[in-house]
């Protein structure tokens, strides 16, 4: 089995580059297409686990034939290949890079699709780890990197790592921002292959509005744009089209399939329309689309974390709620079985993936929210509405409220207001974290300090500590541990910071001076010094 995977993996590595670089003299396009088909078949068989002994031999032969056509870039030819060809699509990769391995088969499918469309773009690959000089010369700075060179000018691909995204981007950058469809048969064939696209109907392919459409098609890097001047063709692509002579709509493969554009035909407005509407009602969060989710113009984002079987019961309800907040709030699903995706989010809340959970982020402010009510349509609707109106209280992590109080009060996120800011006492607060190297020694000194002042009968002074790794509060923004803060009773908004390098005697003197407690010298020279020794 391992040998099968090695052979199939080799096929995948070469699949993306079987289209010859233009400077290679390959006369037989039929052979190219045949090899593409063979390699794609090998990849599909491997995914289904059907690659048997005969399949291994076929894969090896397909790899051998592909090798004879592929220009592999190195330190000697990389720069020349870019300069001598009008259009070159280059994949910079590293053999150890997991993302490179994931991208290669998708890149291969894009190569096959572009080849079938008659694209003149040439494909090449570069092992950036083996040839760092070449990588630097052509602008490969990380792995994987996809670069398109058009007459020597570099364009970096930043879209989704999918076949369709790569194909759409390359066509836009090489002079085909919109596909022209002029027959019903072509429209029906297009629908078999493309699921998300913007369609424009124009009586004539000219004029200011059409030019703005083309500009938008060129600038929007991910969504395929199509154009037609035939209403019957447009109706196949967008059945709800009315009697307009000029029309623009967005088509998606989901229940909310058709979106009509009602704005002015200006590049900026068209792009905004596409950007706000291109995501589905519920976006399934993946490695591939994470960057697009983070960078979305929709800054209010509501996440549902659940196992797949739990989400099935919630999906239709969430979709219905999402319809009421289209273009305003993005609703996202994260499968908690995908630990790499879910855990970083849940850690921000101090939560475990024990049951379905709904959270929210305002990416423009960096604030987070938690829906603590039962997950149902009404509660989710109210949660989203409050988020939109700005009345939803931010969520801050907190341990459970402690039941008992000791000589040093344990403060948690939920009790920070009552225990510190609203307390009538002066509060000496130790802010620590369990992984902090210096915290243990400081904690021992704080305990001695608390005992000393308690023995003196200082009822107006309270000692407290908070573990900032699991407790948060907007008025406690600490990055260094330990941090010692004195909150005077008369001015809780301006805590006084004490150096963590202070010894026990310095701490006692600091507290007594700031709070104007009598007998400073007596205390400084008394029992507390004995404790320190």
UniProtKB/Swiss-Prot annotation:
Catalytic machinery residues: 97 (nucleophile), 436 (nucleophile), 439 (nucleophile)
Keywords assigned: Disulfide bond, Endoplasmic reticulum, Glycoprotein, Isomerase, Redox-active center, Repeat, Signal
Coiled-coil blocks: none
Pfam families documented for this protein: Thioredoxin, Thioredoxin_6
Enzyme class: isomerase
Secretion signal, residue range per the UniProt entry: 1-22
Intrachain disulfide bonds: 436-439
Renumbered ranges of motif Prevents secretion from ER: 530-533
Single Gene Ontology BP annotation: protein folding
Ranges that cross the membrane: none
Glycosylation: residue positions: 151
Reactions that this protein is recorded to catalyse: Catalyzes the rearrangement of -S-S- bonds in proteins
Subcellular location(s) of the protein: Endoplasmic reticulum lumen
Endoplasmic reticulum in keyword set: yes
Enzyme Commission numbers on file: 5.3.4.1
Gene3D superfamilies tied to this protein: Glutaredoxin
Annotated GO MF terms: protein disulfide isomerase activity
Residue ranges of every copy of the Thioredoxin domain listed in the record: 51-196, 387-516
Family assignment from sequence similarity: Belongs to the protein disulfide isomerase family.
Function according to Swiss-Prot or TrEMBL: Acts as a protein-folding catalyst that interacts with nascent polypeptides to catalyze the formation, isomerization, and reduction or oxidation of disulfide bonds. May play a role in storage protein biogenesis.
Protein's UniProt name: Protein disulfide isomerase-like 1-5
Organism of provenance: Oryza sativa subsp. japonica (Rice)
Originating gene: PDIL1-5
